[in-house]
């Protein structure tokens, strides 16, 4: 089915107000969920909203909480999220990293006791729109087996890197081949994954999203490389924030809350003039996109460049929402 941005936001806002979230907070949170969905990231927008409300009802998310600064060390700050609403707090933390970068050329905010930030790409994009390089990542509950193991002991720990090119170039990727949210999107659409995304119950690689959702044997991105990167991202976020690691979140909490996150902004214009920056970025993009195509009908793409097109299409034609997901939200 198709809905408008206004219908989405109104539905989210109603549920949040019914959950006794303060009006101003509910409006800001509903706006972010609707913007994420409008951008085409359904897995961490409309599809994730019922799970968000479940955690709100369970007390994992404390809607009235506000993040508190703990430590300042020049361009680095350490904050405690106090288990506040994840997407609203993440936006504030990237804003703070940008402020630090304006003073120091680079800003780093390490956040502990945080909640799921929904679409991580929103915060990298936020920095790039203002002319900064944006880098951020989060750890998570253990939902992936390290390479060579069967048990989930590492997080998907998504990493975002956004570059202020025209259009913005951005990588937004979990350390698994697919996030669990994207497994759900493909399952709801009745689609196989385009490439292997995990293991079946017999330990064979599979493209069947429902199987991977059930057995939790998701495939690390790049096999052992994604497994290793997940581990070091967790270590850095834990140390810089003095927060919880994947092990602590998994073993000590009843659900995924109290995670650790990193937000970095770099002011490129302190290092290179605007004209030179634009020329260098354009040369990189042209060099890549003019490569001979493997399939003459499929263009060579740069990461993140499709988001502007998706946003325009959804604004023009309406936002596609799975019927069963919309029914869940209406029933909340």
Curated annotation (Swiss-Prot):
A cellular-component GO term for this protein: cytoplasm
UniProt KW Translocase keyword: no
Locations listed in the record: Cytoplasm
Catalytic activity as recorded in UniProt: 3-dehydro-L-gulonate + NAD(+) = 2,3-dioxo-L-gulonate + NADH + H(+); 3-dehydro-L-gulonate + NADP(+) = 2,3-dioxo-L-gulonate + NADPH + H(+)
UniProt keyword DNA-binding, yes or no: no
A Pfam family recorded for this sequence: Ldh_2
InterPro entries: Diketo_gul_Rdtase (IPR023689), Mal/L-sulf/L-lact_DH-like_ah (IPR043144), Mal/L-sulf/L-lact_DH-like_NADP (IPR043143), Mal/L-sulfo/L-lacto_DH-like_sf (IPR036111), Malate/L-lactate_DH-like (IPR003767)
Keywords annotated in UniProt: Cytoplasm, NAD, Oxidoreductase
Enzyme class, broadest EC rank: oxidoreductase
Signal peptide start and end residues: none
GO MF term list: 3-dehydro-L-gulonate 2-dehydrogenase activity; NAD+ binding
Active-site residues from the entry: 44 (proton donor)
Enzyme Commission number(s) of this protein: 1.1.1.130
NCBIfam families linked to this entry: PRK13260.1
Record's subunit section: Homodimer.
PANTHER family: 2,3-DIKETO-L-GULONATE REDUCTASE, OXIDOREDUCTASE-RELATED
Protein name (Swiss-Prot/TrEMBL): 2,3-diketo-L-gulonate reductase
Taxonomic source organism: Klebsiella oxytoca
